[in-house]
C-alpha cells in the first residue's frame, strides 16, 4: 500500500512540472514574437522616413542617444558678462545668407514626395507634371525657389506689434482725414486747388495767354538804365494768380492793366541849378492820357558817387491817377536803385555832428521826398511838387555859466541818505569826469547840478560826489545828510588839498566838545511788514529820535512765486531810531567793538573764507508786536495822553538785560526732568548735572524777560521765543547787523564772546544752530 501511494504522488509531481515548463515556453515565445513584430514595424517606419533623409547630413543611427541626467549646479553669484550687440548688417546677413535649401538640393524626388503629401497641391502637381521631363526629376530650379520665397516675404513681411494696424484702425484714420478735408475751407485750400469748372475758355485765356504786344515786350530788360526814353512801351512784371469764382465775378471785361513809365536822367555834377523835366504818361479806362510834370533836382556831392536825394510828393486828391481805385495790386513796390541810407527820413538824426559842422556853410538843395498816405494803395502814384528846402546845421546853444565869484568853489553834495557801502560814492575829477566833459560839449548831462567856476580857481582840482538813483535812501549812523559841505583848504603847494566834512546836524543840536567824549549816537532800523502809521518824534530829554523813512509795497513775482494770502495788500514800512548812549553804560561795549573791528580789519586777508550764500537770505525783519514791546523801555508818564502808541515806537538795544530777568531755578529739578527739558527743546546733550543746569539757565534768560513770556514746552515755541530775543539783540548792534545783511560769514566764537558781554553765556553749538535756522553765514574758523 505504501509503494502504490508513493508512485501516485510521483506521477502527480511530474505532471505539474511539465505544465509549468510548457507555460514558460509559451510566454517566452510570445515575447519573442512581440519583439519581432515591433522590430518589423520599426523597420517599415524607418524605411518610409529614410526617403526624406538629406543627402548631405543623413541619419547615422536610428537608436536615440542616451539622455544624461543633469543635476542643477550652483548658480553663480557673479555678474554676467554682457553680450556684445550685433550690428543690424550682421543680423541681416545671418538671416538671408544662410542656406535654407540644403534639404531640397539633395534629391528632386524628395521634393516631389513632399508636394504630393501636401493638401490642395493639385494645381502645382499638374504644373509639375506638365513641365517635367521624361524622368520627371525637374520641377523648379534653385533660382525659381528663391524668387518664390522672396515674393512671399515681400507680400507678407514680419511686422512688429507696434507697427501692425488692424482694419478698424486704418478705417478710422481714413475717415478722420476725409472729415478734416471737408471742414477745411480756408483761403489756402482754395489757393492750392485747381481752377473750378466754372471758368470758361476765355477766362483761362485771359489768365494765361499773352497777346502779340505783350510777347514783343518780353525781350525788354528790367533795368531802368537800358530803357530808351523815346520808347512808347515800358517794361512790366506779370504774375499769374488763381482766383476764386467769387473774385472773378467782380472783374469786368472792359478793365485793363496799366503801366507806368519813369525815366530818370542825371545832369552833370557841376550843374547844381538845372533840373531835368520828365513827363509821366498814364492811361485811364476811357483811353484819356494825362501828363504830370515831375521836377527832380540833382545835387552833386564832393565824392565821386552820386548823392541820392530825398524825394517828397504831395498827393493830388482832385483826380484819380492811373486808375488806382479800379485795380489794386498785391505786389510790393519796387525800391529805387538810387536810394541809399541818406534818403531815409531818420538819416538826418543819425549823421555825426562833425559832418554837419564841415558842411556848415553849404546850402543843400534837396527836393521833396515821396510821401504816401496810409489810406491809399501801394501802387497809387503821386504827382510830385518841387519844394526846395535848405537844411542848416543847428547852432550850439550858449553855455550857461554861473556868475564869477572870487571865493573858492564849494561842491555841494546832492546825495540823499546813503548806506555806508563800498560803492555809495563816486569821486569825479575835473580832468576825467564825464559830467564836466558833457557840459563843455553841450550834449546834455544826467546830473542836474552846475558847479560854480571862476578863472582863478580853474586850476584847482575839484571833487564832486555824485549820487546815483540806484543807491539806497536809508540812513544809518554813518549817513551824510544833504546839508553837509566839503571845505577845501589850500596850502602853499597847489597839488595838495585837505578836505574836512562839516556835520549836517543843526547848530542847536550839535554836542559840545565835552559831550562828544561822553555820548555816542546809535542808529537802528526796523522793517515792519505793514503800513505802519507813525509821526516823526524827537525827545531831547532822553536823547532819541524816531522817524519813518519810507513805505514801499511788497512786490511779488507772480510768475515764479506763489503769494501768501496773508501778504496781500501789505506794505513794508522802514523806521529809523537814533538815540544817544551814555559813555558809562556802553564804554565796555564800545571798546570791545572797536578792538574787534581792528582785529577783523587786520586779519581780513587771512580770515577770508569762501562759503555758499544761503538760498533765502533776508534782512532782520521785525513784526508790529516786537516793536510795540520795545516801547516799554521808552515809556514816560510825562508824555501827552493823546499821542498814539505808534508815535512812541523806538529801538532799545539793551531791552534784554540779565539784571531784570527772572530766571527759572533749574536746580530744583531732578536729573530726569532736566533730560526731558533737553529733549523738548532739542538741545545738544551734555554730561553732568551741573553742566545741564548751567546750559538751561543761560538759555532761559532769553525768554524769561520783563515781558513775562510763558515758558515754552515745545521746540517751535522755544525757537520762536529764543530766536526772537537773539534777533533783537543782534539787530541792535550795527556791526553784526551789517555783517548779516552783507552775507559776510559770522565767526561763532566772536559772536559768543560778544553775547557774553551782554550777560548770556551760550554754547557755540546752539549759536551754530541759530545761524543755520535763520540762514546766516557762519563759520567756526578762528
From Swiss-Prot:
Residues 374-388 have a biased composition (Polar residues). The keyword DNA repair applies. One of its GO terms (molecular function) is 5'-flap endonuclease activity. InterPro entries: Slx4_ascomycetes, Structure-sp_endonuc_su_Slx4. The gene is SLX4. It is found in: Nucleus. Phosphorylated in response to DNA damage. HAMAP family: Endonuc_su_Slx4 (MF_03110). This is Structure-specific endonuclease subunit SLX4. Pfam families: Slx4 (PF09494). Forms a heterodimer with SLX1. Residues 63-91, 359-425 are annotated as: Disordered. Residues 73-84 have a biased composition (Basic residues). Keywords: DNA damage, DNA recombination, DNA repair, Nucleus, Phosphoprotein. Regulatory subunit of the SLX1-SLX4 structure-specific endonuclease that resolves DNA secondary structures generated during DNA repair and recombination. Has endonuclease activity towards branched DNA substrates, introducing single-strand cuts in duplex DNA close to junctions with ss-DNA. One of its GO terms (biological process) is DNA repair. Belongs to the SLX4 family. GO terms for cellular component: Slx1-Slx4 complex.
Amino acid at each position: 500500500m505504501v509503494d502504490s501511494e508513493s508512485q501516485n504522488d510521483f506521477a502527480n509531481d511530474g505532471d505539474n512540472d511539465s505544465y509549468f515548463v510548457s507555460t514558460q515556453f509559451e510566454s517566452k515565445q510570445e515575447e519573442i514574437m512581440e519583439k519581432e513584430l515591433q522590430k518589423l514595424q520599426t523597420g517599415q517606419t524607418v524605411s518610409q522616413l529614410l526617403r526624406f533623409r538629406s543627402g548631405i547630413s543623413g541619419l547615422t543611427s536610428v537608436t536615440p542617444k542616451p539622455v544624461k541626467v543633469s543635476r542643477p549646479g550652483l548658480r553663480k553669484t557673479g555678474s554676467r558678462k554682457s553680450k556684445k550687440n550685433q550690428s543690424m548688417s550682421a543680423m541681416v546677413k545671418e538671416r538671408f545668407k544662410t542656406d535654407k535649401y540644403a534639404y531640397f538640393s539633395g534629391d528632386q524626388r524628395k521634393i516631389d514626395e513632399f508636394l504630393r503629401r501636401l493638401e490642395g497641391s493639385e494645381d502645382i502637381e499638374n504644373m509639375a507634371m506638365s513641365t517635367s521631363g521624361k524622368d520627371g526629376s525637374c520641377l523648379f530650379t534653385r533660382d525659381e525657389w528663391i524668387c518664390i520665397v522672396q515674393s512671399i516675404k515681400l507680400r507678407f513681411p514680419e511686422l512688429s506689434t507696434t507697427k501692425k494696424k488692424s482694419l478698424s484702425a486704418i478705417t478710422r484714420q481714413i475717415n478722420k482725414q476725409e472729415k478734416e478735408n471737408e471742414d477745411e475751407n480756408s483761403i489756402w485750400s482754395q489757393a492750392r486747388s485747381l481752377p473750378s469748372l466754372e471758368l470758361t475758355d476765355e477766362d483761362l485765356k485771359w489768365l494765361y495767354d499773352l497777346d502779340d504786344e505783350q510777347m514783343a515786350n518780353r525781350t525788354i530788360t528790367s533795368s531802368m538804365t537800358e530803357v530808351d526814353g523815346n520808347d512808347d512801351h515800358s517794361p512790366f512784371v506779370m504774375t499769374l494768380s488763381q482766383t476764386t469764382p467769387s473774385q472773378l465775378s467782380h472783374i469786368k471785361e472792359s478793365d485793363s492793366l496799366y503801366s507806368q513809365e519813369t525815366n530818370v536822367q542825371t545832369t552833370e555834377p557841376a550843374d547844381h541849378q538845372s533840373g531835368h523835366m520828365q513827363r509821366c504818361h498814364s492811361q485811364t479806362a476811357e483811353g484819356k492820357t494825362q501828363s504830370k510834370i515831375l521836377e527832380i533836382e540833382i545835387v552833386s556831392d564832393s565824392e565821386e558817387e552820386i548823392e541820392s536825394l530825398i524825394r517828397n510828393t504831395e498827393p493830388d486828391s482832385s483826380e484819380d491817377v492811373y486808375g488806382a481805385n479800379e485795380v489794386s495790386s498785391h505786389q510790393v513796390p519796387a525800391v529805387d536803385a538810387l536810394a541809399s541810407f541818406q534818403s531815409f527820413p531818420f538819416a538826418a538824426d543819425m549823421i555825426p555832428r562833425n559832418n554837419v559842422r564841415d558842411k556848415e556853410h553849404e546850402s543843400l538843395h534837396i527836393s521833396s521826398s515821396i510821401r504816401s498816405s496810409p489810406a491809399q494803395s501801394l501802387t497809387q502814384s503821386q504827382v510830385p511838387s518841387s519844394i526846395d528846402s535848405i537844411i542848416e546845421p543847428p547852432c550850439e546853444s550858449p553855455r550857461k555859466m554861473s556868475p564869477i565869484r572870487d571865493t573858492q568853489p564849494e561842491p555841494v553834495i546832492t546825495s540823499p541818505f546813503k548806506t555806508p557801502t563800498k560803492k555809495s560814492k563816486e569821486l569825479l575829477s575835473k580832468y576825467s569826469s564825464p559830467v564836466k566833459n558833457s557840459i563843455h560839449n553841450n550834449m546834455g548831462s544826467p546830473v542836474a547840478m552846475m558847479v560854480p567856476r571862476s578863472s582863478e580857481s580853474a586850476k584847482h582840482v575839484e571833487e564832486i560826489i555824485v549820487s546815483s538813483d540806484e543807491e539806497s535812501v536809508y540812513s544809518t549812523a554813518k549817513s551824510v545828510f544833504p546839508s553837509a559841505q566839503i571845505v577845501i583848504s589850500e596850502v602853499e603847494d597847489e597839488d595838495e588839498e585837505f578836505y574836512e566834512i562839516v556835520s549836517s546836524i543843526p547848530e542847536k543840536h550839535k554836542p559840545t566838545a565835552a559831550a562828544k567824549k561822553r555820548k555816542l549816537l546809535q542808529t537802528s532800523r526796523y522793517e515792519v511788514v505793514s503800513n505802519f502809521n507813525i509821526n516823526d518824534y524827537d525827545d531831547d530829554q532822553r536823547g532819541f529820535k524816531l522817524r519813518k523813512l519810507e513805505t514801499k509795497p511788497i512786490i511779488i513775482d507772480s510768475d515764479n512765486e506763489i503769494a501768501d494770502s496773508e501778504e496781500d495788500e501789505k506794505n513794508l514800512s522802514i523806521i529809523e531810531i537814533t538815540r544817544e548812549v551814555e559813555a558809562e553804560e556802553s564804554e565796555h561795549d564800545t571798546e570791545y567793538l572797536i578792538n574787534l573791528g581792528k582785529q577783523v580789519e587786520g586779519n581780513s586777508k587771512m580770515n577770508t573764507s569762501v562759503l555758499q550764500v544761503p538760498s533765502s537770505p533776508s534782512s532782520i525783519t521785525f513784526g508790529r508786536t516786537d516793536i510795540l514791546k520795545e516801547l516799554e523801555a521808552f515809556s514816560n508818564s510825562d508824555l501827552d495822553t493823546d499821542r498814539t502808541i505808534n508815535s512812541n515806537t523806538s529801538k532799545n538795544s539793551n531791552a534784554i538785560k540779565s539784571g531784570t530777568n527772572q530766571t527759572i531755578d533749574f536746580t530744583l529739578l531732578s536729573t530726569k526732568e532736566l533730560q526731558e527739558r533737553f529733549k523738548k527743546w532739542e538741545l545738544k546733550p551734555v554730561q553732568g548735572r551741573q553742566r545741564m543746569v548751567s546750559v538751561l539757565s543761560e538759555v532761559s534768560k532769553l525768554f524769561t524777560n520783563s515781558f513775562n513770556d510763558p515758558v515754552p514746552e515745545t521746540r517751535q515755541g522755544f525757537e520762536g521765543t529764543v530766536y526772537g530775543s537773539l534777533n533783537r539783540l543782534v539787530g541792535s548792534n550795527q556791526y553784526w547787523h551789517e555783517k548779516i545783511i552783507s552775507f559776510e560769514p559770522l565767526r561763532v566764537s566772536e559772536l559768543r564772546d560778544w553775547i557774553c558781554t551782554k550777560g548770556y553765556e551760550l554754547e557755540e553749538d546752539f549759536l551754530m544752530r541759530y545761524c543755520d535756522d535763520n540762514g546766516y553765514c557762519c563759520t567756526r574758523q578762528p
